[in-house]
């Protein structure tokens, strides 16, 4: 995201909304993580929605749960806003892990759900709400190909410098064993 320098000054952590005249049902809702500029006076922003926080590594335990349960636990633990969460009803294998990102666990649970009931699910942020959808419910009557209006693309690689995890200190209670 970029904009021409003017009286608007954005800082890291500022809320970024991309809407079409409707503050309740916009296109993007997130925060700025990086602000940069140069002599051209074009300000560049790196912005993320709340799924950026799903890269947080933590202790995750889930027994007899579903993909929906895992997403609910992540949202509760990371204080993320939940939206529509469709439940596949498939019990995923037990998770008992630490120092693995929430998003990695969810990706594995999506794979397990694809293998089990053979249904593909996706997790996405819909204007500030984490949603879990069965891909069948997201189909659109749209075809991208030779006869479409898609005429080009670009891509970039990054591992998002200066990203830090929280530090948890855990110790054994000597009196209770």
Predicted regions: what they are:
Residues 1, 47, 59-83, 97-124, ...:
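Amphipathic, non-transmembrane alpha-helical segments in extracytoplasmic/periplasmic proteins
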Residues 1-53, 57, 145-152:
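Assembly/oligomerization scaffold segments
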Residues 37, 89, 137-139:
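Residue-level detector of flexible, active-site-proximal loop/helix-junction positions
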Residues 43, 93-94, 128:
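Generic beta-strand structural signal
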Residues 51, 86-89:
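Short, histidine-centered active-site or binding-site loop motifs used for metal coordination
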Residues 57-59, 92-93:
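Short, contiguous strand/loop micro-motifs
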Residues 88-96:
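Surface-exposed aromatic
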Residues 111, 119-177:
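Acidic, small/polar-enriched beta strand-loop surface segments
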